[in-house]
């Protein structure tokens, strides 16, 4: 029996080891595919655009095609049903398929080839013609103008299409209505973009003013081809040759698109929480993008989505980019239409990154875009994305919470719509999702083990015996795990969480648990820093609190010493003493019924809010080596002050009524008192909210700015992480009591991501 059991155990071990090895290899293979995508973006070809390129006549003879290989490609790529649908064809993209199919048979008919394919294509259009006016179908950009124009061209080529008259009349009515709207709103750029749909109405000389340095019109092969057909131009021809040289015998819907594709990949990796696996590749993309930004690259600045994405990505990664380019991108100037919610959403996200007081235009744009998104919530997969962007601004959602929501709502359908549909695995794909789910669940398993250790620490230090103290151990750990989650930051998480518990205990001790003498005893013990100084006159509560402080601070100090190569314990003690002194001052103000001047209150309250012991010791544990000069520098203190002031005021707004009843100091009534009673509660609250906005804006600027900064980025990010924690905790109730928060804690720590 023993031998059989041993054999069974060995077999299980081999199976388990093999399974782990296979999983690791799968993980590595996925990473390798993503790296390849970053270096070499992929983009689908477009039958619609290829058809228009195929219509281009040779510069040497108008009776011969300039690109016969495109014609051959069309002949070889017709679908069995007679259409020229793309592989990513969606049932709601029938208008796109109709448009592409009609363009293809026009190209074949023009050059007198492929009669069989033309007949099959014509039959498909006739059978599916009703879809051209169905409201449930997604309309490609300019469809209502371009499709009727191509039908006119089909008639000129004597292409016999038996179309249902009512649907045809409806199409013509829509075209005329759309053209009228465009002319009335002076949408010249939009009409130039869909120039192939304007026919004889088009002023091609005016269209050519939109020609780019690469010879194209709007980086669109179809627009450029139509322009060359109407008005031969060497730049247009050179552009078409370059597109075919890159893609073979067919062209994409937009080219070049490398900048956008790479940035979209980076955005995917960052939003799903897996960017740390690709730091080298991402840095290369960011540096290249910044170089193109400084050079005024048309690929960035002449496309609203690319410009917005580049601005947001560069600014959030510390690059010095001004907002001028973004504020010039007004919603009604998009080269498309205002139903392009994707571009609107991209611009809205970019406009949230306001760093300077003089960026009023960016503020105004943010408000305008928010109104547009609220009024025109789109249907389909992007609907939930818009809701999340509006309900959870980037400064009010913790990193891991955002990552989980992004994973759960991730749509790996990478189809996008311009004048036709196109797709790219750089926009979205299953590899991104697989890697993010694996990583999230692996990190979460580690977090659960850390939380168990944290709960043991509470018991070992007898903190559970303090009846006056709120039990917030899980929440304190959650705020750490939800902000800096990587496996190598375990020591920083535990320091954050343990000090979070201790500050809660001390805060409750000063509020309700301790007498004046006990408070003074605790401060004296921390000043002396000697366990032997705990005498019989010290209460049990004081003994438990000080012993816990002594052990925990010493433990964190030891870990800090190993990472920093110097002693940091005295600095951590000093941080705690600053907190205790500020709490004592508040206790004295309350005891004396004293209402201090607002400035005095704020200068003490941002310290007494108790974030110092939570955040500042973590600076030593997140990786970079810090000199004494760095941690004592005004930059570090300013970051701490801004973060803590935001937190204190957020708390005061939410707890005003309760703290008034409890006789505690609060910024709202103090502001009213200091104004001589001339300010209402509503006005005082609004002023505090405005102050929070200004402080948060300055905090973000300091965190993101690299030039002239002494603190390393991982250290500065701790202050921003805590700011997001505070905005979530105090967004509704007084933080800890919110049922929403309980749900979020479970999602981050206890419930693995399971995909259907």
Curated annotation (Swiss-Prot):
Chain positions recorded as Mg(2+) 1 binding sites: 507, 511
Pfam family, one: Terpene_synth
Motif residue range(s): DDXXD motif: 507-511
Record field: catalytic activity: ent-copalyl diphosphate = ent-kaur-16-ene + diphosphate
Record field: transmembrane: 606-622
Binding site residues for Mg(2+) 2: 507, 511
Cofactor note: Binds 3 Mg(2+) ions per subunit.
EC number(s) given by UniProt: 4.2.3.19
Record-level GO cellular component terms: chloroplast membrane
Tissues in which the UniProt entry reports expression: Present in both leaves and flowers.
EC category: lyase
Compartment annotation: Plastid, Chloroplast membrane
Keywords: Chloroplast, Lyase, Magnesium, Membrane, Metal-binding, Plastid, Transmembrane, Transmembrane helix
Binding site residues for Mg(2+) 3: 651, 655, 659
Similarity comment: Belongs to the terpene synthase family.
The protein's role, per its UniProt record: Involved in the biosynthesis of labdane-type diterpenoid including marrubiin and other labdane-related furanoid diterpenoids with potential applications as anti-diabetics, analgesics or vasorelaxants. Terpene synthase that produces ent-kaurene from ent-copalyl diphosphate (ent-CPP).
Protein name as it appears in the record: Ent-kaurene synthase, chloroplastic
């Amino acid at each position: 029996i023993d031998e059989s059991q041993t054999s069974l155990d060995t077999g299980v071990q081999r199976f388990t080891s093999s399974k782990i090895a296979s999983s690791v290899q799968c993980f590595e293979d996925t990473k390798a595919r993503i790296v390849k995508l970053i270096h070499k973006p992929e983009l689908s070809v477009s039958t619609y655009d290829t058809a228009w390129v195929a219509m281009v006549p040779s510069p040497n003879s108008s009776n011969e095609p300039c690109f016969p290989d495109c014609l051959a490609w069309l002949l070889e790529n017709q679908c069995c049903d007679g259409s020229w649908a793309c592989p990513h064809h969606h049932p709601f993209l029938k208008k796109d398929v109709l448009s592409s199919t009609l363009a293809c048979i026009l190209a074949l008919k023009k050059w007198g080839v492929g009669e069989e394919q033309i007949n099959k294509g014509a039959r498909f259009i006739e059978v599916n013609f009703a879809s051209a006016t169905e409201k449930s179908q997604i309309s490609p950009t300019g469809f209502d103008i371009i499709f009727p124009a191509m039908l006119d061209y089909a008639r000129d080529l004597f292409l016999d299409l038996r179309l249902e008259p009512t649907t045809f009349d409806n199409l013509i009515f829509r075209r005329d209505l759309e053209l009228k709207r465009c002319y009335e709103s002076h949408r010249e750029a939009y009409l130039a973009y869909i120039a192939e749909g304007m026919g004889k109405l088009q002023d091609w000389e005016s269209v050519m003013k939109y020609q780019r340095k690469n010879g194209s019109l709007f980086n669109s092969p179809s627009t450029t081809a139509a322009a060359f057909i109407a008005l031969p131009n060497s730049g247009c021809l050179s552009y078409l040759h370059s597109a075919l040289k890159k893609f073979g015998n067919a062209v994409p819907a937009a080219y070049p698109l490398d900048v956008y594709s790479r940035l979209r990949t980076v955005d995917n990796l960052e939003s799903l929480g897996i960017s740390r696996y690709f730091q080298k590749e991402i840095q290369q993309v960011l540096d290249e993008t910044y170089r193109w930004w400084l050079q005024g690259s048309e690929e960035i600045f002449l496309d609203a989505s690319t410009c917005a994405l580049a601005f947001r990505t560069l600014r959030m990664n510390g690059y010095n980019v001004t907002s001028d380019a973004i504020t010039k991108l007004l919603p009604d100037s998009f080269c498309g239409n205002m139903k392009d919610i994707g571009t609107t959403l991209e611009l809205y996200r970019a406009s949230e990154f306001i760093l300077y007081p003089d960026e009023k235009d960016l503020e105004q744009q943010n408000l305008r875009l928010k109104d547009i998104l609220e009024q025109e919530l789109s249907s389909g997969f992007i609907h939930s994305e818009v809701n999340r962007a509006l309900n959870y601004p980037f400064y009010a959602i913790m990193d891991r919470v955002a990552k989980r929501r992004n994973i759960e709502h991730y749509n790996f359908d990478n189809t996008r719509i311009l004048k036709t549909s196109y797709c790219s695995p750089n926009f979205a794909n299953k590899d991104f999702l697989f890697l993010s789910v694996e990583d999230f669940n692996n990190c979460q398993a580690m977090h659960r083990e850390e939380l168990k250790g944290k709960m043991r620490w509470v018991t070992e230090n007898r903190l559970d015996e303090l009846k006056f103290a709120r039990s917030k151990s899980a929440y304190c750990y959650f705020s750490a795990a939800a902000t800096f989650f990587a496996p190598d930051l375990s020591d920083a998480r535990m320091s954050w969480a343990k000090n979070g518990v201790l500050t809660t205990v001390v805060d409750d001790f000063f509020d309700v648990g301790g007498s004046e003498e006990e408070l003074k005893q605790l401060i004296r013990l921390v000043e002396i820093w000697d366990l032997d100084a705990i005498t019989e006159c010290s209460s049990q509560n004081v003994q438990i609190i000080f012993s816990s402080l002594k052990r925990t601070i010493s433990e964190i100090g030891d870990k800090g010493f190993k990472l920093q190569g110097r002693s940091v314990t005295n600095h951590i003690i000093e941080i705690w003493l600053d907190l205790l002194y500020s709490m004592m001052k508040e206790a004295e103000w309350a005891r004396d019924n004293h209402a201090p001047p607002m400035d005095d209150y704020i200068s003490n309250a941002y310290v007494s809010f108790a974030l110092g012991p939570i955040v500042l010791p973590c600076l030593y544990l997140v990786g970079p080596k810090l000199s004494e000069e760095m941690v004592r520098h005004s930059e570090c203190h300013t970051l701490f002050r801004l973060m803590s002031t935001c937190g204190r005021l957020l708390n005061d707004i939410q707890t005003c009524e309760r703290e008034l009843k409890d006789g505690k100091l609060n910024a709202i009534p103090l502001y009213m008192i200091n104004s001589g009673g001339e300010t209402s509660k509503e006005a005082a609250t609004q002023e505090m909210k405005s102050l929070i906005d200004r402080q948060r804006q300055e905090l973000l600027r300091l965190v993101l700015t690299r030039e002239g900064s002494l603190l390393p980025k991982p250290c500065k990010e701790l202050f921003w992480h805590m700011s997001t924690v505070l905005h979530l905790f105090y967004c509704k109730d007084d933080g800890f009591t919110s049922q929403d928060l309980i749900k979020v804690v479970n999602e981050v720590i206890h419930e693995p991501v399971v995909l259907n």
